[in-house]
């Protein structure tokens, strides 16, 4: 199970109260595999502008670190059942059309990574859904076509030919 710092929710709620335009607030995190802790593998993008730029490249939020406004969740239509493994990523993208987001600089959550987890067991399906959502983000947020197409094609090649997943 994932676990949070005792002050995580308080700090995130204070941030949301301080900035009424925020609809989504995450935090940095650590990963725990077995008994080994490591830094987060996802690049940390803290500002709304950086988060928007990253959405068509990767999901900058770890679900366990996120709080959001219920009103915005409802306005965005909640979780989309078309996605089994990327519901959160899709929701974050839709919520960004309704307000701003941030990721707090401090590591306020530890995520347990396990080979038994649904995410680990269904990596291929999760990557495919991520690719679909990244394409949606690319169209919605209008980032650089060349850069985004490179990453979209790289992800697609990695899905079709898994042994090439780590090419640069």
Model-flagged regions — what are they?
Residues 1-124:
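Nucleotide-sugar donor-binding/catalytic module of glycosyltransferases
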Residues 83, 89-90, 97, 101-168:
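C-terminal subregions of glycosyltransferases and related glycan-biosynthesis enzymes
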């Amino acid at each position: 199970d994932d676990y949070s710092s005792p002050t995580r929710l308080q700090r995130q709620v204070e941030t949301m109260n301080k900035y009424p335009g925020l609809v989504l607030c995450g935090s940095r995190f650590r990963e725990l595999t077995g008994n080994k802790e490591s830094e987060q593998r996802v690049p940390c993008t803290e500002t709304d502008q950086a988060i928007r730029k990253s959405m068509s490249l990767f999901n900058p939020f770890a679900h366990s670190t996120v709080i959001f406004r219920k009103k915005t969740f409802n306005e965005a239509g909640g979780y989309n059942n078309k996605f089994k493994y990327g519901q959160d990523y899709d929701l974050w993208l839709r919520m960004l059309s309704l307000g701003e987001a941030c990721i707090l600089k401090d590591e306020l959550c530890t995520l347990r990574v396990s080979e038994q987890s649904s995410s680990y067991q269904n990596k291929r399906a999760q990557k495919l859904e991520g690719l679909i959502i990244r394409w949606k983000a690319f169209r919605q947020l209008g980032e650089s076509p060349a850069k985004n197409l490179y990453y979209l094609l790289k992800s697609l090649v990695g899905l079709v030919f898994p042994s090439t997943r780590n090419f640069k």
